[in-house]
Amino acid sequence: MSEDHVNKLTADIFKALAHPVRIKILQMLKKRTYCVCEMMEIMDVEQSNLSQHLNILKKQGLIDSEKAGQRVNYHIVHPCVAELIEVAEKLIGE
């Protein structure tokens, strides 16, 4: 894979992270799996809005979902995603 291609893919990941709602989703998912209904309650966002944010994160391979009956549960795909959020929090002193 060329360096330019890797740089574009890296930029795409950072674009996916570039929204406070998506950061909040990842902060929640680094603790445990959540379904959409739980996230809606905690975050006070509309389902359509939340679904758009989840799809952006999923498209970049940062999260994945698993159907459990009527529920769709989301989780972080790789521990380094949580580590990336933690590094950003350290940079701002949180």
Located regions from the model:
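Short, intrinsically disordered or compositionally biased N-terminal tails of bacterial proteins
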Residues: 1-6
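N-terminal helix-turn-helix DNA-binding core of bacterial DNA-binding proteins
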Residues: 8-48, 61, 68-79
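Short, intrinsically disordered/low-complexity patches at protein termini
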Residues: 48-50, 59-60, 87-89
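Residues within the DNA-recognition helix of helix-turn-helix
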Residues: 53
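Alpha-helical DNA-recognition elements
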Residues: 56
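Conserved segment of winged-helix/HTH DNA-binding domains
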Residues: 73-94
